[in-house]
């Protein structure tokens, strides 16, 4: 009997730097590449149409690239635990390869499949390629616990062995005599389905701003590196209006779905830096997004409650308000704050928003204005963000809501001033909220302050054509900062830790925030400085402030455990949430 191999694609939707697939092909007589899709999840899971479209485009591109190698992608409907025993028998499989999945549900799923494979006499190959590092080794280096500060994480990885270089791309030379058995009805039995076949209504669906697939990912990588090359000092680009728009060099969804290897990106960045800087060693900051990605993956890998507040040992238990009406206004871009609403509109239409825009809407929903749980925001991002995955989405929301990782809760974004500073003319607002297009720049971020005559000329009456602000930012932010302060004081007493040492002695000052023109902004003083809760966040990652979170479990604020929801199948198979990196790939 020959060696019949199957490679199971989940994330890692690519032929470059795919060590599990490469090893699976070696010595095999036949190879079949499969992707298991449960159509039931398309209608029931919390995943929007833009994300499903991106996934299907990734699968179509993968199939097209396999065709060039006289192979095909086999898209199989069903559940892995039901599908594989049948395939093992039907195809006489002797070898199965998979990319290692670090997320708790993925590890549980893969353990079950490995057991089925062993019982069927099938060899299983598992290789790490969705992350740069072996996360278990990072945790081992840290005494068996994940590092909960970025500084500590950087210290740990600096002690690890150099990264392995990407493996060669799967080509006809790599495949050699390994063939793929194909039938005439392959498309009918194993073809990539359409959105319509999955039950989606595509009427009015605009063309994709982010086309899915490995081919697009590699094209974007070259553009991204060309852009980097002229930024000889590799500093962070300055934020401006154009930064808010989707870029043809953006990479985050492609890293998320594994269309682009993080290792390839890492080594391309390294090579470029050495070329520009004449062989000097690159700083860790060069790899901003990649390392933040690893940081959150490491924090989440052994914590199945990472996406929950209750029962999550690293999450502060905060008594958030339940307010479905306010949540819907935020999610649908109806808050009455044009900056917030434009961001949420872009997210719903295109599936992507700039990482600082993510910070702004996350702060507004949680500790800044609405006092709604980060879990609710995380679910909306899970539905709409192309680059949202389980670990990074949950980790980012905990971080931005001051529920974990740092506690500078007295720093907030002003939902008027931050946008005005970024895009003074308001072009971004006009693009995504055309109802406000007629307002002059002076009033486009706070149209409720425009005289009635200007509103009439703009053909937009506030409260009729566009909503009034749903909250008074000044009052809400002051109240919420006080709430946070009380929670952390209680937690400090409960754990016997001095967590509030960094709270400014003058909480009504602007605390060194960037200044905005703040006249007549709800929540900002007329003196020209942002009031409490109205500035830019300052990020700190002091180790001493984090130690209690490792052991906390349930604080005195907790209310017990709640049942976990199984991730959707689409979420299982691909898994960057709100961007928190110092250097963006967008």
From Swiss-Prot:
- Where in this protein would one find the motif LIR 4, according to its record? 255-260
Q: Where is this motif: LIR 2?
A: 82-87
Domain Photolyase/cryptochrome alpha/beta, by residue range, is 3-132
Positions of short motif LIR 12: 486-491
Residue runs in coiled coils: none
Question: In chain numbering, where does the motif LIR 8 fall?
Answer: 379-384
- Annotated stretches, region: Interaction with TIMELESS: 471-493
Please give the cofactor(s) recorded in the UniProt entry for this protein: FAD; (6R)-5,10-methylene-5,6,7,8-tetrahydrofolate
- The organism's superkingdom is given as Eukaryota
Instruction: For this UniProt record, give its keywords in alphabetical order, as a comma-separated list.
Output: Biological rhythms, Chromophore, Cytoplasm, FAD, Flavoprotein, Isopeptide bond, Nucleotide-binding, Nucleus, Phosphoprotein, Photoreceptor protein, Receptor, Repressor, Sensory transduction, Transcription, Transcription regulation, Ubl conjugation
Task: State the span of motif (LIR 11).
Answer: 430-435
Region named Required for inhibition of CLOCK-BMAL1-mediated transcription: 371-470
Q: Motif span (LIR 9)?
A: 395-400
Residues that hold FAD according to the record: 252, 289, 355, 387-389
Give the residue ranges of motif LIR 1.
50-54
Localization per record: Cytoplasm; Nucleus
Query: What SUPFAM superfamilies does this protein's entry cite?
Result: Cryptochrome/photolyase FAD-binding domain (SSF48173), Cryptochrome/photolyase, N-terminal domain (SSF52425)
Kindly state the positions of the motif LIR 3 in this protein.
151-156
- Recite the UniProt cofactor note for this protein: Binds 1 FAD per subunit. Only a minority of the protein molecules contain bound FAD. Contrary to the situation in photolyases, the FAD is bound in a shallow, surface-exposed pocket.
Annotated region described as Disordered, given as residue ranges? 545-586
Give the modified residues of type Phosphoserine. 71, 247, 280, 568
Q: Which cysteines are joined by disulfide bonds?
A: none
The membrane spanning regions, by residue number, are none
What domain comment accompanies this record?
The LIR motifs (LC3-interacting region) 3 and 5 are required for its interaction with MAP1LC3B and for its autophagy-mediated degradation.
Q: Subunit structure, briefly?
A: Component of the circadian core oscillator, which includes the CRY proteins, CLOCK or NPAS2, BMAL1 or BMAL2, CSNK1D and/or CSNK1E, TIMELESS, and the PER proteins. Interacts directly with TIMELESS. Interacts directly with PER1, PER2 and PER3; interaction with PER2 inhibits its ubiquitination and vice versa. Interacts with FBXL21. Interacts with FBXL3. Interacts with CLOCK-BMAL1 independently of PER2 and DNA. Interacts with HDAC1, HDAC2 and SIN3B. Interacts with nuclear receptors AR, NR1D1, NR3C1/GR, RORA and RORC; the interaction with at least NR3C1/GR is ligand dependent.
- What is the name listed in the Swiss-Prot or TrEMBL entry for this protein? Cryptochrome-1
């Amino acid at each position: 009997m020959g060696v019949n191999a199957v490679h199971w694609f989940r994330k890692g939707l690519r032929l470059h730097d795919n060590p599990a697939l490469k090893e699976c092909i070696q010595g095999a007589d036949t190879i079949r590449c499969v992707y298991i899709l449960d159509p039931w999840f398309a209608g029931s899971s919390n995943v929007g149409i833009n994300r499903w479209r991106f996934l299907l485009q990734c699968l179509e591109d993968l199939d097209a690239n396999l065709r060039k190698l006289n192979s095909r992608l086999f898209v199989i409907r069903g559940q892995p635990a039901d599908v594989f025993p049948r395939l093992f028998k039907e195809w006489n499989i002797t070898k199965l390869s998979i990319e290692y999945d670090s997320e708790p549900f993925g590890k549980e799923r893969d353990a079950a499949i490995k057991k089925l494979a062993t019982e069927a006499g099938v060899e299983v190959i598992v290789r790490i390629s969705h992350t740069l590092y072996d996360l278990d080794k990072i945790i081992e280096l840290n005494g068996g616990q994940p590092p909960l500060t970025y500084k500590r994480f950087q210290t740990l990885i600096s002690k690890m062995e150099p990264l392995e270089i990407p493996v060669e791309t799967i080509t006809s030379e790599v495949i050699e005599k390994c063939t793929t058995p194909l039938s005439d009805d392959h498309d009918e039995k194993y073809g990539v389905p359409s959105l319509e076949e999955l039950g989606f209504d595509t009427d009015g669906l605009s063309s994709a701003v982010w086309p899915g697939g490995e081919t697009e990912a590699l094209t974007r990588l070259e553009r991204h590196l060309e852009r980097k090359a002229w930024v000889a000092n590799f500093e962070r680009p300055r934020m401006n209006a154009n930064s808010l728009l989707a870029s043809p060099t953006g990479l985050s969804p492609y890293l998320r779905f594994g269309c682009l290897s993080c290792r390839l990106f890492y080594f391309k960045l390294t090579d470029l830096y050495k070329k520009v800087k004449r062989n000097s060693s690159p700083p860790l900051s060069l790899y901003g997004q990649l390392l933040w990605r690893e940081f959150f993956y490491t924090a989440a890998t052994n914590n199945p409650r990472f996406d929950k507040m209750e029962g999550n040992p690293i999450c502060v238990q905060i008594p958030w308000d339940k307010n479905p009406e306010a949540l819907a206004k935020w999610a649908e871009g109806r808050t009455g704050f044009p900056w917030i609403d434009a961001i949420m509109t872009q997210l719903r239409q295109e599936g992507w928003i700039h990482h600082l825009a993510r910070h702004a809407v996350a702060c507004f929903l949680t500790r800044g204005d609405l006092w709604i749980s980060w879990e609710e925001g995380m679910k909306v991002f899970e539905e709409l963000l192309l680059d949202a995955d389980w670990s990074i989405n949950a980790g980012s929301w905990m971080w931005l809501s001051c529920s974990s990782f740092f506690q500078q809760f007295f720093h907030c974004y002003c939902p008027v001033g931050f946008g005005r500073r970024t895009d003074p003319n308001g072009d971004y607002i006009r693009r995504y909220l055309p109802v406000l297009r007629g307002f002059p720049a002076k009033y486009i971020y706070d149209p409720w302050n425009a005289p009635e005559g200007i509103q009439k000329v703009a053909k937009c009456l506030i409260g009729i054509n566009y909503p009034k602000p749903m909250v008074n930012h000044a009052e809400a932010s002051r109240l919420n900062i006080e709430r946070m302060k009380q929670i952390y004081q209680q937690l400090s007493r409960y754990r016997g830790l001095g967590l509030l040492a960094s709270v400014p002695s003058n909480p009504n000052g602007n605390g060194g925030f960037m200044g905005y023109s703040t006249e007549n902004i709800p929540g900002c003083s007329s003196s020209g400085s942002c009031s409490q809760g109205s500035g830019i966040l300052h990020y700190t990652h002091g180790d001493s402030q984090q130690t209690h979170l490792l052991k906390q479990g349930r604080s005195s604020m907790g209310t017990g455990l709640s049942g976990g929801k199984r991730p959707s199948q689409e979420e299982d198979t691909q898994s960057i949430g709100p961007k928190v990196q110092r250097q963006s790939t967008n």
